[in-house]
Amino acid sequence: MFGFSRTLARSDQLDERTSRFIGMMGEAAEQMTELLDQLGTSARIAADRWEPVLREVDTLELVREADAETPAVGEGASVETEADAVGRALRSLARAARVYGRIDEVTWHVDGRALELAPVNAEAGPVVSGEDVRDLGSLVARQVVEALGGSVALAGETLRVEL
């Protein structure tokens, strides 16, 4: 569906309304692909069949590359991790903090292997920490981080992710 919508979007013969609908189709297809990827990762972790591809990355660069919408400040450190899955996890956590907290911006504060997301208000806290099962991305994010030997913990209005 995603490929089909991209092909249609390239056509010069579409009116504005049709182009808008084709764009919406493409966005929905991307969301579905991400959802299926999250479900697949979660299932492999639960079945103890996940085989992460580890590579060395800088934590600050990882956060910045994973989520251009969320500012990241601080000083990174080199870690060996499954960069793609962790990047998706961090992006999901930040998105959930914004959506469920009904706020426009959160920020990642990076200190070596420790990543702190703030503010995570009272409405978003239970969802982002995985206590309230309303966001698949947050649940899978926690699974990924913990499967790689890290941790996710909420302290006040700060979500701390240790890689």
Q: Model regions: which residues?
A:
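Short alpha-helical segment of the dimerization/phosphotransfer core of two-component systems
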Residues: 27-32
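A conserved beta-strand-to-alpha-helix junction within the catalytic ATP-binding
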Residues: 53-67, 87
